[in-house]
């Protein structure tokens, strides 16, 4: 359904959904960067001056977590994988009504190609090095 007005005001962009999968509401298109326009009229240039056709866009990486790992998160992640995204599921930031449901969702997601990660794994991968300007701040949050 609709997002809470107070939360919506804090966000640049929001997605209201009624389907269990947010991809059904256009999440994949929303996350994909816009295509870059081609410059000039290629037919007007000699072949040796024409720009090569753009390579296929790199697979975007989506980091996902949520409350109902076995319902909305599962269906959204599976649809994003089908839509050619690389999906990282932050397992320690996911829940379900029961551990069995959560673990079954993780098993299914791993089998479909999702990367199962933890909050710390994501944080340190994004930092890349202890020389990152935010390293000490992140370390303080984790400890």
Predicted regions, residues:
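Fold-independent oxyanion-binding glycine-rich loops
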Residues: 17-18, 67, 91-93, 119-120
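Short, solvent-exposed polar/charged micro-motifs at secondary-structure junctions
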Residues: 25-27, 126-129
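Short coil/turn connectors at secondary-structure junctions
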Residues: 57-60, 83-86, 112
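Active-site alpha/beta core segments
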Residues: 1-72
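Active-site acidic carboxylates
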Residues: 1-17, 78, 86-89, 97-98, ...
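Short gly/pro/ser/thr-enriched loop/turn and capping motifs at secondary-structure boundaries
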Residues: 21-23, 71, 94-99, 123-125
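Short glycine/serine/threonine-rich phosphate/pyrophosphate-binding segments
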Residues: 69-76, 83
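Short hydrophobic alpha-helical module
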Residues: 33-37, 79, 83, 112
